[in-house]
Amino acid sequence: MALGLEDKKAIVAEVSEVAKTALSAVVADSRGVTVSSMTELRKEAREAGVYVRVVRNTLARRAVEGTDFECLAESFVGPTLIAFSNEHPGAAARLLKAFAKTNSKFEVKALAFNGELIPAGDIDRLATLPTYDEAIAKLMSVIQGATSKFVRTLAAVRDQKEQEAA
């Protein structure tokens, strides 16, 4: 279906607006994936706070101009699905990596984070980033471990001094 100029401008504006506020982006090729699988992917993306859109390459290039994701422009070749993470940098990478495992025809082309182009083979760099809550939990466990070790050391010193005094 041919898109009119106004429709194209609206798509570019929408994708550009999302790109300006997104934390990371993933570009993939969804050629050969069934409609029901894509519908399921879109549903999971909404739940994960990930914006997913199939966009024409020229429109995608225009949409990412002047954003951190301009480095992705060369990966807009062939059918292009672009996913932006809005809440957590690794959300889109994690979602599309899991989807690619169950759909052999789905292929991740490239990723971008902080203006850096990341090859598809390095998807784990983003996919394994802990969420904010996970990072806080890890930090708290490290602090708690260090604190409890310090308290045990103080108790041992106290017990040792009590034994020497007795």
UniProtKB/Swiss-Prot annotation:
Keywords: Ribonucleoprotein, Ribosomal protein, RNA-binding, rRNA-binding. It comes from the Bacteria. GO terms for cellular component: large ribosomal subunit. One of its GO terms (biological process) is translation. It holds the Pfam family Ribosomal_L10. InterPro entries: Ribosomal_uL10 (IPR001790), Ribosomal_uL10-like_sf (IPR043141), Ribosomal_uL10_bac (IPR022973), Ribosomal_uL10_bac_type (IPR047865), Ribosomal_uL10_CS_bac (IPR002363). The keyword Oxidoreductase does not apply. One of its GO terms (molecular function) is large ribosomal subunit rRNA binding. The keyword Repeat does not apply. PROSITE patterns: RIBOSOMAL_L10. Part of the ribosomal stalk of the 50S ribosomal subunit. The N-terminus interacts with L11 and the large rRNA to form the base of the stalk. The C-terminus forms an elongated spine to which L12 dimers bind in a sequential fashion forming a multimeric L10(L12)X complex. Belongs to the universal ribosomal protein uL10 family. This is Large ribosomal subunit protein uL10. It comes from Marinomonas sp. (strain MWYL1). The gene is rplJ.
